[in-house]
Design a protein with these regions (language model features):
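N-terminal accessory targeting/assembly segments
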Residues: 1-97
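Glycine-rich phosphate-binding P-loop
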Residues: 146-152
Length: 152
């Protein structure tokens, strides 16, 4: 894997961040970018970068509600309303398999999310390839070399 491929998931996940936060993410050192698991944006606090075993505060400005909405707009390609169906589970999946977890208030009608209310935080979970973890499970989903009906 070359240098560019190593940081591709990190860059993809950071691509939905507002400019000041993306610059802060890009300013992280190489070991931090390699170990990063998520970006956390909490209303009123600087963005943090979560590594495998620690959380680092970035040099970003404090997060505003407008910043949180910008992330959703970037993730939904300019229309937060287009993600309503996808957000029912509490997260939105973006290009590259990265997930944005949401925390805040929504407007409900008959048990269905109708609109976003106030957002208080979000986490952008960086998807990473983990090789070899499915080896043992493979024998359980194959029947005479054919893949059984499987939900992963």
């Amino acid at each position: 894997m070359n240098h560019g491929e190593t940081f591709l998931p990190y860059r993809q996940a950071a691509s939905v961040l507002p400019d000041a936060f993306r610059r802060a993410a890009e300013g992280a050192n190489e070991p931090a970018r390699r170990r990063a698991e998520e970006f956390r944006l909490r209303l009123g606090a600087p963005m943090t970068i979560v590594l495998e075993d620690e959380e680092h505060e970035s040099d970003s400005p404090p997060v505003t509600e407008a910043d949180l909405r910008t992330v959703l707009e970037q993730a939904s390609r300019a229309s937060a309303h287009t993600v309503l169906d996808r957000v029912r589970s509490g997260y939105v999946t973006i290009c590259g398999g990265h997930r944005i977890g949401l925390c805040g208030e929504v407007v409900m009608k008959q048990g269905q999310i109708q609109a976003f209310g106030r957002l208080s935080s979000l986490s952008i979970r960086i998807a990473k390839q983990v090789t070899g973890v499915g080896g043992q499970a493979l024998s359980g989903i194959l029947d005479r070399g054919q893949l059984c009906s499987t939900l992963i």
